[in-house]
């Protein structure tokens, strides 16, 4: 606590006076550009990894970056989503998972959690679809690899939950909302973007980031590419669906390559 108190003192005596005009503007209202939904994990700082300034992100954080579907017990996520889009007119949403996620590890031992941490057990029910998909379709992988598969699949599951909200469906229909699925790799600092799946009809940009072909990283057969400051972001353009997707390497690695079983249901964009 002493470090926190010292930090508060430094903020009030040093940082605040040199940014007084900014805080006076904040007192008049907020105008964030992006709704950023991510995990409560202490190793993730949305403003740090995106190099965003104060007031640029409207952030929702919880264990596992979960989004209860519309109509589920209200834990605050739904109200925050509705406020961000309806009141603040945010047009971009990022759902960001991360490597080594403790919540995803918990999904693999859910029955044990029911006794040890019943509240966590109840909360993770919002990721049951992710758990069932992975356990039914990814047999034969080691635990560490399954965690990383869960991380990626969970991002897509939560995007589907997000799309159950009336305000989200309405803005998607109007073309006024874009949804992005990201995976932050704690060990490398790299952020990967997942493209929409073949079952999606709208709402998730299909590879708006373009890389030279040699640098493109295919994960789970999706178009998943590193997002770095050197990469130019172009407006999304329609991409042809590629029926055959290059297979991942034979040796599965939890740092980047995910499993081949998902290739049949995933789009992959062309690098240009």
Swiss-Prot record:
Classification via SMART domains: Pro_CA
Family: Belongs to the beta-class carbonic anhydrase family.
Catalysis: reaction(s): hydrogencarbonate + H(+) = CO2 + H2O
Pfam family, one: Pro_CA
Enzyme Commission no: 4.2.1.1
Binding-site positions, Zn(2+): 39, 98, 101
GO cellular component: carboxysome
Cofactor note: Binds 1 zinc ion per monomer.
Upper classification of the organism: Bacteria, Bacillati, Cyanobacteriota, Cyanophyceae, Synechococcales
Cofactor(s), names only, from the UniProt record: Zn(2+)
Stated role: Reversible hydration of carbon dioxide. Essential to photosynthetic carbon dioxide fixation, supplies CO(2) to RuBisCO (ribulose bisphosphate carboxylase, rbcL-rbcS) in the carboxysome. Loss of activity results in limitation of CO(2) availability to RuBisCO located in the cytoplasm.
Name the record gives this protein: Carbonic anhydrase
Source organism per UniProt: Synechococcus elongatus (strain ATCC 33912 / PCC 7942 / FACHB-805) (Anacystis nidulans R2)
Biotechnological applications listed in the UniProt record: Heterologous expression of 12 carboxysomal genes in E.coli (ccaA, ccmK2, ccmK3, ccmK4, ccmL, ccmM, ccmN, ccmO, ccmP, rbcL, rbcS, rbcX) leads to the formation of bodies that resemble carboxysomes, have densely packed paracrystalline arrays and RuBisCO activity. These structures open the door to generating carboxysomes in plant cells to increase their photosynthesis and productivity, as well as tailoring bacterial microcompartments to specific metabolic needs and molecule delivery. The absence of ccaA, ccmK3, ccmK4, ccmP and rbcX leads to less active RuBisCO.
Domain of life: Bacteria
Gene Ontology terms describing biological process: carbon fixation; carbon utilization; photosynthesis
Keywords associated with the record: Bacterial microcompartment, Carbon dioxide fixation, Carboxysome, Lyase, Metal-binding, Photosynthesis, Zinc
Gene name tied to this protein: ccaA
Traits of the deletion mutant: Essential for photosynthetic CO(2) fixation, cells do not grow in normal air, but will grow in 5% CO(2), called a high-CO(2) requiring phenotype, HCR. Cells do not grow in 2% CO(2), and grow more slowly than wild-type at 5% CO(2). 70% reduction in the efficiency of RuBisCO carboxylation activity from isolated carboxysomes; there is probably considerable oxygenation of the substrate.
Matching SUPFAM superfamilies: beta-carbonic anhydrase, cab
InterPro entries for this protein: Beta_CA_cladeB, Carbonic_anhydrase, Carbonic_anhydrase_CS, Carbonic_anhydrase_sf
Conditions for induction: Carboxysome size and components vary with growth conditions. When grown in ambient air at medium light (50 uE meter(-2) second(-1)) there are 14 units of this protein per carboxysome, the numbers decrease slightly under low light, and increase under high light and high CO(2) (at protein level).
GO molecular function: carbonate dehydratase activity; zinc ion binding
């Amino acid at each position: 606590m002493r470090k926190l108190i010292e930090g508060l003192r430094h903020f009030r005596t040093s940082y605040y006076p040199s940014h007084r005009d900014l805080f006076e503007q904040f007192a008049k209202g907020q105008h964030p550009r992006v709704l950023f939904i991510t995990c409560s994990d202490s190793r993730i700082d949305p403003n740090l990894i995106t190099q965003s300034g104060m007031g640029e992100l409207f952030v929702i954080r919880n264990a596992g970056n979960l989004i209860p579907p519309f109509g589920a017990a209200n834990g605050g996520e739904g109200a925050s989503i509705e406020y961000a889009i309806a009141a603040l007119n945010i047009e971009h949403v990022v759902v960001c998972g991360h490597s080594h996620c403790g919540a995803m590890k918990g999904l693999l031992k859910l029955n044990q959690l029911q006794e040890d941490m019943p509240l966590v057990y109840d909360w993770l029910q919002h990721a049951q679809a992710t758990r069932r998909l992975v356990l039914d379709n990814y047999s034969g992988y080691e635990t560490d690899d399954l965690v990383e598969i869960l991380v990626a699949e969970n991002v897509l599951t939560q995007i589907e939950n997000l799309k159950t909200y009336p305000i989200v469906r309405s803005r998607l229909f109007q073309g006024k909302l874009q949804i992005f699925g990201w995976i932050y790799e704690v060990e490398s600092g790299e952020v990967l973007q997942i493209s929409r799946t073949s079952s999606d009809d709208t709402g998730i940009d299909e590879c708006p980031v373009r890389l030279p072909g040699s640098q493109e990283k295919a994960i789970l057969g999706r178009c998943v590419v590193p997002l770095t400051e050197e990469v130019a972001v172009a407006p999304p353009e329609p991409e042809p669906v590629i029926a055959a997707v290059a297979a991942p390497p034979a040796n599965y690695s939890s740092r980047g390559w995910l499993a081949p079983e998902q290739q049949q249901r995933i789009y992959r964009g062309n690098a240009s």
